[in-house]
């Protein structure tokens, strides 16, 4: 018996698409399959390039929140942090957006919330910027700018976090600028701002390879590292302390200097302009004579090396125009005075300029000579250097030949057993 195919008819009441066909059996069949897709909001965490990153604590990459109603409104379970660290990296919040395409302007509210649209553009993506740790460092000397050879010098390094990421694994070591005349420290005192100071031991090896500071430096904070070194060198030599610090940030360096004490004169560098070092003129004990006499400086081992070294005047200036004068006061004792005709004769003075002043590579260059300098003890100013006579440097030195320096005293002046003193006033005149 032949089987005639049955007509399969599928339609709907609202005249939507109809299906007509034939069923190969004698029985009428109708099958309808439904595909149900569960709509959800997926949370994503990416960097500025769109690459997925480790999310903040309390959040899950790819977490899905079901849309439970046709009017579902998504709200994040908690506020997004302004910054966080994960996996050794630091991130700062840039904003978030809804959907698949990143807009030009992100929404910056920290708790994302919005009405869903059920169109495949309901996911939430939070964008964070990966921060690069950066730091600055300074090195200062906390003791005097000169040190006796064999004496100690104390230094302080200040490491400051200049980025939006914490500084970690920080180390400090000597740099290539370190002068051999400075010994390695044996310990460091590390003090985070607002924290507790701790002592870190230092060896020759760690000073070369890097001393771990054992502390992190938060965003916007700093830490100080103080250490002491022994300085050894010749008189007047400049020694440089140079350090490098690094960690999860690129290495940065700083340096400072100290000068080995001069055997004869104090050296104190003015902040702006003035005198770095001035000489003393000591004529020792002289005899009262019946005629005018010129007396030389005293000879002593502790006074300009028994005459083997010269007194000098060293100045610092910043203005392009400068001149120098000097004047001598009347020599007086407790009960007597020498006449104002008394003279201090300094002779001609070679003038030198400096390059790389106060650096280990400091060079002194002779650039000229003054005329003969004779000061009369009546406080009259005598011109020493004329305006713009010497140019091209900010540090100059006048050297006075030890054997040329004389004190001229008239006949029969002075009293036995009296000590006479007078002041030489040096006047540095500068201007634009």
How does the language model describe each region?
Residues 196-205, 263-432:
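Signature of Gram-negative chaperone-usher
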Residues 35-62, 127-164, 254-298:
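Serine/threonine-rich, low-complexity linker/repeat segments that form flexible spacers/stalks
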Residues 131-258:
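Exported/extracytosolic protein signature
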Residues 1-24, 157, 228-260, 346, ...:
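Serine/threonine-enriched low-complexity regions used as flexible
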Residues 10-13, 18-45, 103-133, 229:
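Conserved "repeat-terminator" motif of extracellular CCP/Sushi domains
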Residues 1-5, 120-126, 130, 210-241, ...:
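Low-complexity, intrinsically disordered segments enriched in Ser/Thr together with acidic residues
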Residues 1, 73-85, 166-180, 324:
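Surface-exposed beta-strand/loop patches in extracellular or lumenal glycoproteins
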Residues 1-18, 76-109, 234:
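Surface-exposed interfaces of beta-sheet-rich extracellular modules
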């Amino acid at each position: 018996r032949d089987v005639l195919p049955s007509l399969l008819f599928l339609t709907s009441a609202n005249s939507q698409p109809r299906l007509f066909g034939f069923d190969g059996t004698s029985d009428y069949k109708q099958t309808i399959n439904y595909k149900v897709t569960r709509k959800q909001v997926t949370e994503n965490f990416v960097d500025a390039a769109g690459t997925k990153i480790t999310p903040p604590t309390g959040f899950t990459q790819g977490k899905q929140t079901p849309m439970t109603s046709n009017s579902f409104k998504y709200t994040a379970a908690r506020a997004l942090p302004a910054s966080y660290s994960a996996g050794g990296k630091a991130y700062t919040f840039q904003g978030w957006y809804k959907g698949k395409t990143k807009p030009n302007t992100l929404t910056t509210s920290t708790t994302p919330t919005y009405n869903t649209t059920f169109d495949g553009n309901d996911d939430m993506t939070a964008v964070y910027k990966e921060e690069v740790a950066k730091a600055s460092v300074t090195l200062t000397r906390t003791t005097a700018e000169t040190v006796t050879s064999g004496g100690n010098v104390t230094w302080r390094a200040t490491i400051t976090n200049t980025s939006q990421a914490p500084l970690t694994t920080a180390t400090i070591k000597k740099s290539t600028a370190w002068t051999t005349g400075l010994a390695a420290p044996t310990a460091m005192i590390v003090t985070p701002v607002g924290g507790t100071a701790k002592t870190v031991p230092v060896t020759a090896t760690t000073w070369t390879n890097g001393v771990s500071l054992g502390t992190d430096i938060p965003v916007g904070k700093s830490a100080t590292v103080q250490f002491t070194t022994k300085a050894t060198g010749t008189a007047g030599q400049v020694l440089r302390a140079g350090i490098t610090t690094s960690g999860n940030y690129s290495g940065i360096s700083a340096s400072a200097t100290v000068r080995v004490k001069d055997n004869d004169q104090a050296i104190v560098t003015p902040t702006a302009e003035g005198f770095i070092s001035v000489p003393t003129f000591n004529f020792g004990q002289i005899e009262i004579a019946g005629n005018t006499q010129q007396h030389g400086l005293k000879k002593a081992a502790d006074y300009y090396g028994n005459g083997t070294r010269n007194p000098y005047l060293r100045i610092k200036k910043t203005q392009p125009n400068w001149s120098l004068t000097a004047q001598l006061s009347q020599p007086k004792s407790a009960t007597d005075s020498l006449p104002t005709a008394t003279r201090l004769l300094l002779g001609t003075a070679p003038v030198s300029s400096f390059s790389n002043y106060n650096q280990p590579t400091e060079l002194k260059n002779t650039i000229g000579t003054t005329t003969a300098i004779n000061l009369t003890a009546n406080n009259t100013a005598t011109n020493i250097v004329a305006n713009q006579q010497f140019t091209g440097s900010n540090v100059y030195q006048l050297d006075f030949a030890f054997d040329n320096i004389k004190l001229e005293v008239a006949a029969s002046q002075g009293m036995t057993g009296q000590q006479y003193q007078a002041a030489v006033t040096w006047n540095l005149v500068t201007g634009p």
